[in-house]
Amino acid sequence: MLETIKYSFVLPAYKAKYFREAIDSILNQTYADFELVIVNDASPEDLDSIVNSYDDKRIRYYKNEQNRGGKDLVAQWNHSIAYARGEYLILASDDDEYSPLYLERMDALVDKYPHVNVFRPRVKRINHKGKIVRIEGYQPEYLTKVEYLYAWTNLWIGSGIPFYVFKREALLAIGGFASYPLAWFSDDATVLRLMEPGIVTCNMTLFTFRLSTESISTTQNSKASLSAKLKATKMFCDEHNRIINDYIPQNEEDVLLLSLIKKFFPRMIRKNKVRSQLKISSLATIISTIGDSVKIDGVSLFYVLKCCKYPILNSLKSLVVPKR
């Protein structure tokens, strides 16, 4: 039986372009007690030669016989973490990078807050040319569930599966990463399910998130993709609202923050998810989706947009959908 260690970096791999840089950033950690589990998702690119160029006992390499991520990205994530043996998991990406101090600083916080399930660093975001487009602002080291949701609702902090450290036991207890269509909102939903004891942030910029134009969740521009993402949007809105409505305020500050979250949540969804997706979708795709009266688990496209208070698309409805 393999010995349990403290941390597992799990790297589902498909693209070769930044793959070596991603591996190097993990192996260059100043904290040494970790393994790197690489899962080749039946990539058509030559990942084998890149992995085989490393002589490092911390690497364990697996290959899927068939591609999983193209059909269900979250299923591939959950399949990949099954190979890990660490007490804490980091689901890495094949095009993002970690600072050498990432794990050392995360470990200090893990030891300081043993009851917490989710840890995150401050994040820098770059475009495909490597240019910095955003650096997150400072946050308190520890945030309660409602404090984090308030910060997230105001877009002060973002989400992204690769930069979190997850407590393995807690993650498996909720069935792994949240399964949403095209992994749309899967990162947010997973954190939401795990953060009852709060969330911890390191205010050092320890992770570089590459805003790739090649990911599954960003490249698809079709009616099916738009419908799937709108379905995921409704799923997340329902889950978020249910959790917020069930939350019992602990003090007057919680009461205020909850009221503000309820007020500004639709704006955040509209700005951060719906609008961004509509921006990359062609007008023909949008009109086709509307014209076919696409249903999302029995809920129309316009119901989702209405929940997000998206007036432009509500106006467009009258132009392209005949009255019945």
Question: What residue spans do the PLM features occupy?
Answer:
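Acidic donor-binding segment of Leloir-type glycosyltransferases
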Residues: L27-Q66
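Glycine-rich, basic loop-to-helix element that forms the pyrophosphate-binding segment
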Residues: E65-A84
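Membrane-interface aromatic/basic loop that binds lipid-linked glycans or pyrophosphate carriers
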Residues: M1, K263-R324
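Short, well-formed alpha-helical segments that are part of the catalytic scaffolds
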Residues: K15-N28
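The conserved acidic donor/metal-binding loop of glycosyltransferases
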Residues: S93-E97, R122
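Conserved donor NDP-sugar-binding/catalytic core segment of glycosyltransferases
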Residues: L101-I135
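Short aromatic/hydrophobic "clamp" motif used to bind/position activated sugar donors
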Residues: L89
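Conserved nucleotide-sugar donor-binding catalytic segment
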Residues: F9, L143-A228
